[in-house]
Amino acid sequence: IIPIKEEDIIESLENLKQLQNKISSNNLTDSNKALSLAKEISGIPLIYYPWGLQAAGIRFKNSLQENAKMHAMVEDVVEASHNGIVAWENESQVFPILLQGDKDNIKTKERWKILKIYFDNSKIEYKEIFSIKGNILAKLIHLIYLLDYTSIYKAVISKIDPTPVKSIDFIKSR
């Protein structure tokens, strides 16, 4: 459990207000990070995350599945640097997304660097997303909000209505 202080909540809300103006549907320009990321996602996204940002990575996967109605995967960067890297030896429709923290452990930073070198040498396109600076609550809330919007924009770009969830309704009706 993360110990949360009142100032952590206030910082999170202040960051969220700033982000809201930048990524809302009132700003459909290239400066909208959520929209730009949605345009870049192709194939099957594989979201790599470090320790501490697992919740944001899993939430992004779930949001892409529910809103954009697309397959998505998630994996810890440590595992990606072990067994997960082997899968990249074959051609793939997978698009790696590297969800990085501003204060990742030094060993994690080394893993990111090595993974990017491998992708570059193998001519595998990838996208890096960096958390904001601040407390862990602010980072998680900021990333979740940004990536939720990304999943909605991805749905709209793909001409998919993000609101109905017929398959979930089917399961629930049984």
Functional labels for PLM-detected ranges:
Residues I1-R174:
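A SIS-like phosphosugar-recognition module
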